[in-house]
């Protein structure tokens, strides 16, 4: 079966494992976008460490879960998010003001919406987590 959206598959795997109360989850295939998204999640403490396993194919990622994640998902299609529209997206996707993050891909790399606001840059929306 062909995977259409590897980021959506990865986030759904993490979501399902978190709901079941698992300690670890295996994600395959591995991609740069997934690794950067997981790095943003790890920076904010929603997941633990993750390890990239190179199997000379598509690669695998083993993610340690902390039990802090409530929901994560992908935003499809990847809408353009301007700096002035960031507040509107925040109200639509996140449960409250100081809770959760929207992940954007910008010209300065993949980052959360607060870092994008500090760097004064917009981009395309990848997903969210809280």
UniProtKB/Swiss-Prot annotation:
<comment type="similarity">
    <text>Belongs to the universal ribosomal protein uS8 family.</text>
</comment>
<protein>
    <recommendedName>
        <fullName>Small ribosomal subunit protein uS8</fullName>
    </recommendedName>
</protein>
<dbReference type="GO" id="GO:0005737">
    <property type="term" value="C:cytoplasm"/>
</dbReference>
<dbReference type="GO" id="GO:0042274">
    <property type="term" value="P:ribosomal small subunit biogenesis"/>
</dbReference>
<dbReference type="InterPro" id="IPR047863">
    <property type="entry name" value="Ribosomal_uS8_CS"/>
</dbReference>
<dbReference type="GO" id="GO:0032040">
    <property type="term" value="C:small-subunit processome"/>
</dbReference>
<keyword id="KW-0539">Nucleus</keyword>
<dbReference type="GO" id="GO:0005730">
    <property type="term" value="C:nucleolus"/>
</dbReference>
<keyword id="KW-0687">Ribonucleoprotein</keyword>
<dbReference type="GO" id="GO:0003735">
    <property type="term" value="F:structural constituent of ribosome"/>
</dbReference>
<dbReference type="GO" id="GO:0005840">
    <property type="term" value="C:ribosome"/>
</dbReference>
<keyword id="KW-0689">Ribosomal protein</keyword>
<dbReference type="Pfam" id="PF00410">
    <property type="entry name" value="Ribosomal_S8"/>
</dbReference>
<comment type="function">
    <text>Component of the small ribosomal subunit. Part of the small subunit (SSU) processome, first precursor of the small eukaryotic ribosomal subunit. During the assembly of the SSU processome in the nucleolus, many ribosome biogenesis factors, an RNA chaperone and ribosomal proteins associate with the nascent pre-rRNA and work in concert to generate RNA folding, modifications, rearrangements and cleavage as well as targeted degradation of pre-ribosomal RNA by the RNA exosome. Required for proper erythropoiesis.</text>
</comment>
<comment type="subunit">
    <text>Component of the 40S ribosomal subunit. Part of the small subunit (SSU) processome, composed of more than 70 proteins and the RNA chaperone small nucleolar RNA (snoRNA) U3.</text>
</comment>
<dbReference type="InterPro" id="IPR000630">
    <property type="entry name" value="Ribosomal_uS8"/>
</dbReference>
<keyword id="KW-0963">Cytoplasm</keyword>
<dbReference type="GO" id="GO:0006412">
    <property type="term" value="P:translation"/>
</dbReference>
<dbReference type="InterPro" id="IPR035987">
    <property type="entry name" value="Ribosomal_uS8_sf"/>
</dbReference>
